[in-house]
UniProtKB/Swiss-Prot annotation:
Family matches, as NCBIfam families: frr
Xref: SUPFAM superfamilies: Ribosome recycling factor, RRF
Role, per record: Responsible for the release of ribosomes from messenger RNA at the termination of protein biosynthesis. May increase the efficiency of translation by recycling ribosomes from one round of translation to another.
Protein's UniProt name: Ribosome-recycling factor
Natural source organism: Paracidovorax citrulli (strain AAC00-1) (Acidovorax citrulli)
GO term, biological process aspect, one: cytoplasmic translational termination
Coiled-coil region(s): none
The gene coding this protein: frr
Keywords from the UniProt entry: Cytoplasm, Protein biosynthesis
Chief localization: cytoplasm
Example GO molecular function: ribosomal large subunit binding
A GO-annotated cellular component: cytosol
The keyword Protein biosynthesis is annotated on this UniProt entry: yes
Amino acid sequence: MTIADIKKNTEAKMDQSIVAFKNNLAKIRTGRANPALLDSVQVEYYGSMVPLSQVANVSLIDARTISVQPWEKGMGAKIEKAIRESELGLNPASMGDLIRVPMPPMSEERRKEMTKLARNEGEGAKVAVRNLRRDANESVKKLVKDKLASEDEQKRAEADIQKVTDKHIAEVDALVAAKEQEIMAV
C-alpha cells in the first residue's frame, strides 16, 4: 500500500462516516415533519421485525404531517402500534387505509434535549474522523519504518491527512450548527 492509497482510503472512510452522521442527524426530531424520522421504526411482518419502509410508503402531507400508506390492508394496525411504541413521541391516526402521523409541537425543554443529542452525534462523528486520521498516520509511519517511504514523505502525508481531517470536522460542525438552528426554529 502506498501513501497515495492510504490518503485516498482515509478520505473515502471519512466521507462514509460523514454520510452515516448525516443519516443519524436526519433521525433527530425537529419541529418539522421528515420521513427519515420513521426509518428506525420496526414493524412485525409475518413473524419477523422489518423496517417500516419495507411494508409501507412514507411521505409528507405538509410541513407537520407524515403519511404512511401500508402496501397490505391488514398492516395498518401493526404499523400504527409500531409508531406509537417507538420512542419518538408520535401519535399516529388511522384514516381508512392511510395513517397520518402529525408532528406535535416541541416544548423548549424537548428542543434543548434534541440540540444536545445533535451535539453528541457530532462529537461521535468527530471522534470517528480523528480515529481514521490516527489509523492513517500509523499506516504511514509503518511504511517509513519498513523503508517504503522517506520521512519527508511522511511529514507531507501527515499534513495532507490533517487537512482532510480538518475539512471533515468543519463539515460536521456546520451540519450540527444547521441542525441546531432547525431544532430551535419555532
